[in-house]
């Protein structure tokens, strides 16, 4: 799917139908006016758009769809494909899809999807054992998730960074990330106790590794509450 301006769409459709400028213009406007529209040098009225849409056998909504709207739709689709490929463990193809989506998001400022792409690429790098790249991806995503107040994604970012720090035996850093995760869980009032238990077990483990048995016991007790 190419991302096209209004003029580019009209020109592409006209060429596909082998219509000349004069044929598309008909008795409604001049060929010169159509040429201006195709070069995005002229504004069009709703009435004229309805005429052009009928001549080109498309909807007015299609013609009115902006580059930003098209880029959102295209990156939504690439992200969905990427998520499916990750679930199928086809990580290389998933990475290709998401990198393509990131380029489009960056060019057209589709910030929500830009954050999601970075999050999913971080997941891929986590699975590959590329921990530094993974943390960088989660941190990029965090910036936008914080701006959008996306609590669910924030929780997952902090949790996964904490898991990576555990693997790397950076236990103080892991605890800090898990504390951020715990704060979000409390804020959104998650009812699934198993989510809390899983988090508390990780925190207890980190405190044991830091020889802080008292804090470790606190979190072990929390698991039984």
Where does each model-flagged region fall?
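A short, Lys/Arg-rich alpha-helix, primarily the initiator
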Residues: 1-16
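Residue signature of alpha-solenoid helical repeat architecture, marking inter-repeat boundaries
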Residues: 72-73, 112, 152, 194
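Short alpha-helical DNA-recognition segment
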Residues: 18-37
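Amphipathic alpha-helical segments of tetratricopeptide repeats
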Residues: 99-106, 139-149, 179-189, 221-225
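DNA major-groove recognition helix of helix-turn-helix/homeodomain DNA-binding modules
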Residues: 47-62
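Residue register of alpha-helical TPR repeats
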Residues: 76, 116, 156, 194-198
